[in-house]
């Protein structure tokens, strides 16, 4: 449990597009009194910290600095965004071997100075690297969290909200499983302010059929690729997703977010990190919720878990 105190320290490992934008989003949110950026590119990291610090007059008091792992000591949360960038046409799972080796150098250093911190993994493939972090750190599963499908779920809500012309925040649904190509949309539990989506669509004379579900799902699943094809990387939305998770932890909100967690017995799935609805609070992941899926969704989730397990089994250096 993160103890109540006057200062809150967050360290961000990796000062690339995602890391720097995450630091910016955290700065704007006002959740931290100190943000530390660490990256192998010292000059760029110093520049990012300087640039952010120059906005001090426009936000709550916050000390932003660049440094080494020693400077992260005593962090409440360590956000890990470091890793090889996803290239055009490259799936998240193809990144694994490159990023495992990077994590082998990062995690021991993070743990050395932050034995009580919560680790929030953002680097892709996030589910696999969350599992790798869990194993390398020796931390309890509650304190090793992946950003999971929080962003994918936001994309799904956005797609439905756009088509139905309603506030996406009124759409209750989840993307579960891998943050990537085998993720699943939980249509069976999707509702609009507690009205089942099929009932809502019927009452409002809106489209809701196999074609609708397929089109929406494909748009969500391929969203990152579409952004990467146009601008080279995704970083704004994921930075907001990370900030949302951080706020849930620091505020001990006990809110439900589909983060990546160690699944131990859910539809027969064991010993793998997957995006699951979890209660997130001051202790990190306080509980993973075993929501009831229909047979098709459950089968797809099992396959998603198998995909990730196969990747782990085939990865070099594990």
UniProtKB/Swiss-Prot annotation:
InterPro entries recorded: L-lactate/malate_DH, L-lactate_DH, L-lactate_DH_AS, Lactate/malate_DH_C, Lactate/malate_DH_N, Lactate_DH/Glyco_Ohase_4_C, NAD(P)-bd_dom_sf
UniProt keyword annotations, A-Z: Cytoplasm, NAD, Oxidoreductase, Phosphoprotein
Pathway(s) it belongs to: Fermentation; pyruvate fermentation to lactate; (S)-lactate from pyruvate: step 1/1
Primary residence: cytoplasm
Catalysed reactions listed for this entry: (S)-lactate + NAD(+) = pyruvate + NADH + H(+)
Tagged with keyword Cytoplasm: yes
EC number annotated for this UniProt entry: 1.1.1.27
Class of this enzyme: oxidoreductase
Protein residues bound to NAD(+): 18, 39, 44, 69, 83-84, 105, 122-124, 147
GO cellular component: cytoplasm
GO terms for biological process, alphabetical: glycolytic process; lactate metabolic process
Binding of substrate, residues: 86, 92, 124-127, 152-155, 234
Pfam families on file: Ldh_1_C (PF02866), Ldh_1_N (PF00056)
Location(s), subcellular: Cytoplasm
Residues at the catalytic site: 179
Residues with Phosphotyrosine modification: 225
Subunit annotation: Homotetramer.
Task of the protein: Catalyzes the conversion of lactate to pyruvate.
Record family assignment: Belongs to the LDH/MDH superfamily. LDH family.
Protein name per the record: L-lactate dehydrogenase
Species name: Clostridium botulinum (strain Langeland / NCTC 10281 / Type F)
Primary gene name: ldh
């Amino acid at each position: 449990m993160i103890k109540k105190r006057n200062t809150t320290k967050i360290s961000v490992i990796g000062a690339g597009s995602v890391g720097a934008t995450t630091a910016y989003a955290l700065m704007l949110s006002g959740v931290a009194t100190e943000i530390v950026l660490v990256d192998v590119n010292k000059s760029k990291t110093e520049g990012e910290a300087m640039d952010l610090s120059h906005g001090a007059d426009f936000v709550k008091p916050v000390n932003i600095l660049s440094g080494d792992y020693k400077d992260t000591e005593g962090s409440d949360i360590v956000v890990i965004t470091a890793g090889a960038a996803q290239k055009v046409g490259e799936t998240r799972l193809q990144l694994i071997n490159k990023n495992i080796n990077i994590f082998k150098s990062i995690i021991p250093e993070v743990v050395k100075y932050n034995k009580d911190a919560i680790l929030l993994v953002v680097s892709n493939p996030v589910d696999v690297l969350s599992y790798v972090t869990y194993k390398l750190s020796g931390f309890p599963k509650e304190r090793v969290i992946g950003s999971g499908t929080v962003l994918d779920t936001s994309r799904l809500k956005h797609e439905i909200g756009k088509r139905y012309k309603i506030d996406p925040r009124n759409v209750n649904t989840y993307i579960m499983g891998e943050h990537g190509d085998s993720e699943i949309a939980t249509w069976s539990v999707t509702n609009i302010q507690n009205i089942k989506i099929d009932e809502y669509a019927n009452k409002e004379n809106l489209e809701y059929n196999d074609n609708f579900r397929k089109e929406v799902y494909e748009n969500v699943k391929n969203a990152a690729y579409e952004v990467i094809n146009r601008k080279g990387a995704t970083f704004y939305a994921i930075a907001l997703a990370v900030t949302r998770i951080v706020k849930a932890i620091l505020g001990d909100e006990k809110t439900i977010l589909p983060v990546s967690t160690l699944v131990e017995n859910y539809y027969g799935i064991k010993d793998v990190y997957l995006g699951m609805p979890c209660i997130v609070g001051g202790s990190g992941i306080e509980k993973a919720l075993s929501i009831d899926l229909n047979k098709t969704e459950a089968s797809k989730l099992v396959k998603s878990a198998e995909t990730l397990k196969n990747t782990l089994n085939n990865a070099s250096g594990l």
